[in-house]
A protein has these predicted regions:
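N-terminal localization/anchoring segments of enzymes in phospholipid and broader phosphate metabolism
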Residues: 1-527, 545-549, 561-585, 589-675
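Catalytic-core loop-and-flanking beta/alpha module that positions acidic residues
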Residues: 542
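Hydrophobic alpha/beta core scaffold segments
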Residues: 552-556
């Protein structure tokens, strides 16, 4: 028997749980639409990275197997088979929600169902807003198929010259920055591509439009960087980002159009790829025909529309922790260590702390890691302001996938302001989230640290659940000082910390040691691990051994889980759960009954434990330890948003009509009650 679930199929199962949220009839309609948007965006990234990587392994005949022993070709086939039915489910769900929205006055209307007055408005919109922005190509002997960037959205048409009767093909690119949903009247929307399609004869004069289809391509978007050859890492990353849009096509999505037109488009793309990538045979791309609009990720335009608030869940306002109500945040932290649970407790104190430090004359230095900070960052702006007055050192991780460009921009801005900027660590990704502020008061140096499971991004802090920790304890600060020194000197793998634990050297051995300690207690042992993913085979094997010793193990794994629970003789004492709800579960909390409870930036994956700089933080303060344990206990009682994984890889929603509990709703109400 195979001891592990396949990584890729386990991720797809997570995305299925996201799709299930869109099916939840208890949710407001735009909330359901939001989950369809998330589902599609997730799948885009899965194809850009995971499927693209498997294709590379297959095409280069690299004998690499998944944790379950499946080779790349087998995994690609399993992915295609898994999605074949689910894509149809997604389409049906969209059509159901679309019909319900129509009854509420939000109408996504096909162009051919518009009346004459509405079509006149669409024509005006085309002339004023779209005509100058679309890029039409007539494909003939002098105009070959152009390169298509990742996530290109376009129309492909068969056209006939009215004079010569010659039939040819045309490509019309639609820019990504246009509004997809055009509101012709209050609540009446038509898709931009349908407006363009209806006016193609204005782009191809003296031609008759015979057939047309919308299509979208997804390309390999992984960035390969040879760090050994990098003299200017920022410049190398900048050049690599320019190449991202030139990746090989891995997925084709089409809508409408005849089978003949579809075959012509597919053949054209394959021919283009064969010549562009100099392959002996056309590359195999996954091709899907859609009965609904392409790219449901654009549904965010409707979800965020200001006119339909009654169709959305009410906004929750995060609460300010009472200990941060004082004007001087540093005094609050000096009094006691504090732990916040975002988004229920506000992220504002983190931003305020940096802003206060930047303007405080007693501040000597600020050291910080930045992983994903977003395009509009008050934190970076505060650091830029501080850099003109005090010592500011920032480690900006340029390898944060899909945030490379934003991070590069902020790194350059910080450098211009006078900050010392380090672009990551050689062959490691810095994923630890840490901040160290040093002040001088009463002729003494005082250190303040902030450590977190989540990013320094106020926007994501409103939708991701994370814990963040504030301390003025010297033993913690000393470890962080040591770690920053090692990062600045590129010797991260050689640092041994005293209070905290750091990957790639310390976290995995520590977790294994903690599992072994619970094994010594046999049936009295108890482990709860909450993470985004569990993939590391060594950790999984130790959990199997602990189960066989009688240790009770509860795993709360939001996404990928390669461990097989409830297998007789292997994992009978292991239960695996996943919570998918309004907020994205992102905190990593690790509880060991006979030792301690920890929080971490690291998931239980080889990349986190072996190829990244991560932190594992013990909760030595009893109040903080109890708060972390309370989070786990409530999530294990969830009967509305919790799924359980069985030994066959199936997820089933946990239900108890007599005791309904949504853990995320509970924490919202608890925050209101407490504060």
């Amino acid at each position: 028997m195979n001891r592990f679930f396949n990584r890729e199929l386990s991720w797809l199962a997570f995305n299925t749980r996201v799709l299930n949220e869109a099916k939840d009839e208890s949710l407001p309609l735009l909330e359901r639409l939001k989950f369809l948007a998330i589902y599609d965006t997730n799948l885009d990234e899965f194809y850009m990275i995971r499927v693209a990587g498997l294709k590379q392994l297959y095409e280069h005949k690299i004998a690499s197997k998944g944790i379950d022993g499946a080779n790349p070709e087998e995994q690609l086939e399993k992915i295609k088979h898994y999605l074949a039915h689910e894509i149809e489910e997604r389409e049906l769900e969209f059509q159901k929600i679309q019909a319900l929205l129509f009854k509420k006055g939000l109408c996504i209307t096909p162009y051919n169902e518009l009346n004459l007055e509405q079509k006149a408005k669409a024509k005006t919109y085309f002339k004023e807003q779209l005509y100058a922005l679309v890029l039409p190509f007539k494909l003939d002997s002098s105009h070959t198929f152009p390169p298509l960037a990742n996530l290109t959205f376009a129309l492909f048409a068969r056209i006939k010259d009215k004079e010569t009767q010659t039939i040819s093909y045309a490509l019309i690119k639609l820019p990504s920055f246009i509004f997809r949903f055009v509101e012709l009247e209050k609540g009446l929307f038509v898709l931009a591509e349908e407006i363009v399609e209806a006016h193609l004869e204005e782009l191809f004069l003296e031609h008759e439009i015979l057939d047309c289809m919308a299509f979208r391509v997804t390309c390999d978007a992984d960035i390969a960087i040879t760090e050994d050859e990098a003299h200017d890492y920022a410049d190398l990353m900048s050049k690599s980002l320019r190449k991202r849009n030139q990746g090989e096509i891995v997925r084709l999505q089409t809508q409408k159009g005849s089978q003949e037109l579809f075959k012509t488009l597919l053949a054209s793309l394959r021919s283009f790829q064969t010549h562009s990538y100099k392959k002996h045979k056309p590359t195999g791309m996954h091709a899907y025909k859609s009965a609904i609009m392409l790219n449901l990720g654009d549904l965010w335009e409707l979800v965020n529309h200001s006119d339909f608030k009654t169709l959305k869940s009410p906004n929750f306002t995060p609460k300010i922790h009472p200990h941060f109500n004082e004007n001087d945040l540093f005094k609050s932290i000096e009094k006691q260590d504090l732990l916040l649970f975002h988004p229920y407790e506000s992220f504002e104190p983190v931003v305020d702390l940096i802003e206060q430090a930047a303007s405080d004359p007693t501040t000597l230095s600020i050291k910080m890691t930045l992983y994903r900070v977003g395009k509009h960052s008050p934190i970076v702006k505060a650091l830029i302001e501080a850099a003109s007055k005090i010592q500011v050192s920032v480690l900006v991780e340029l390898k944060a996938r899909f945030d490379e460009e934003s991070n590069l921009h902020w790194a350059k801005a910080l450098e211009r302001a006078g900050a010392l900027v380090v672009y990551g660590v050689f062959k490691l990704k810095v994923h630890a989230k840490m901040l160290l502020i040093t002040k001088k008061t009463d002729n003494q140096l005082r250190h303040f640290t902030h450590l977190s499971t989540g990013n320094y991004n106020p926007l994501s802090a409103k939708v991701y659940t994370d814990v963040s920790f504030f301390s003025a304890k010297n033993e913690i600060a000393n470890d962080i000082i040591k770690l920053f020194h090692s990062l600045l000197t590129s010797s991260a793998t050689n640092s041994a910390l005293e209070t905290l634990f750091m990957a790639p050297k310390q976290i995995k051995p520590k977790i294994i040691e903690l599992i072994q300690n619970e094994m010594n207690h046999k049936q009295e042992g108890y482990i709860i691990l909450k993470a985004n993913a569990l993939v590391d085979s060594e950790i999984i094997e130790w959990l199997y051994q602990a189960s066989q010793k009688g240790v009770k193990i509860d795993l709360i794994i939001r996404g990928i889980c390669c461990l097989k629970p409830q297998v007789k003789g292997l994992s009978e004492n292991i239960r695996v759960y996943s919570i998918v709800g309004k907020y994205l579960e992102h905190a990593r909390i690790y509880y060991f009954k006979h030792e301690n409870i920890y929080f971490s930036s690291a998931d239980l994956m080889p990349r986190n434990l072996e190829r990244r700089v991560e932190l594992l933080v013990p909760a030595t303060n009893p109040k903080i330890a109890n708060k972390l344990l309370h989070i786990l206990e409530i999530q294990l009682k969830d009967t509305l948003k919790r799924y359980e994984l069985d030994s066959k890889g199936r997820y089933t929603k946990v239900s108890n009509p007599n005791d309904p509990l949504n853990s995320q709703d509970y924490f919202e109400k608890q925050a209101l009650k407490t504060f």
